[in-house]
Amino acid sequence: LRGQLLLEPSENLDINLSIDYSNRDENCCSSVTIVRGPTAAIIDALAPDSGVAPVADPYARRAWSNRSSAQYIEDNGGSLQIDWNSPWFGGATLTSITALREWSSTNGIDFDYSTADILYRNPEKGDNFTGFETFSQEIRMAGATDNVDWLVGLF
């Protein structure tokens, strides 16, 4: 979901508000066995039925997960850009861009990566295991003369 709103309160001022939101339910990820260590026989004994730890062959692209690998991802953000054609320096444009973004992921992981059900993290919506928030601010002024186009700013 995305939206933008452009306001032009005067011929010298533009204000652009942009927001977005997305969420997805996915299934991701497992790993392949690269090395079968000395505990493989113990893991096999703990596995239900006649489970056997996967063979150490990363090129076979075989992975094992005996629990859900559900993943819930939420991503949203917005920005506000203000452009003002100033009376300074021959009509230079002063621009301010303020932005905020949040991202979070909750995922189920079969941590033992084997046929045994030893270690697992259950994906509960609302439990934020991974995420970030970012804020940014940019201010710049751009203009031109007969011989030079110029730009100065801070981020």
Locations of the language-model features?
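Outer-membrane beta-barrel signature, preferentially recognizing the C-terminal barrel domain
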Residues: 65-66, 71-77
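Transmembrane beta-barrel wall of Gram-negative outer-membrane proteins
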Residues: 1-29, 37, 76-80, 131-137, ...
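Short secondary-structure capping/turn segments at boundaries of alpha-helices and beta-strands
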Residues: 68, 79-81, 125
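Outer-membrane beta-barrel and related beta-rich outer-membrane complex signature
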Residues: 15-63, 99-114, 153
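Extracytoplasmic loops and strand-loop junctions of Gram-negative outer membrane beta-barrel proteins
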Residues: 58-66, 118-125
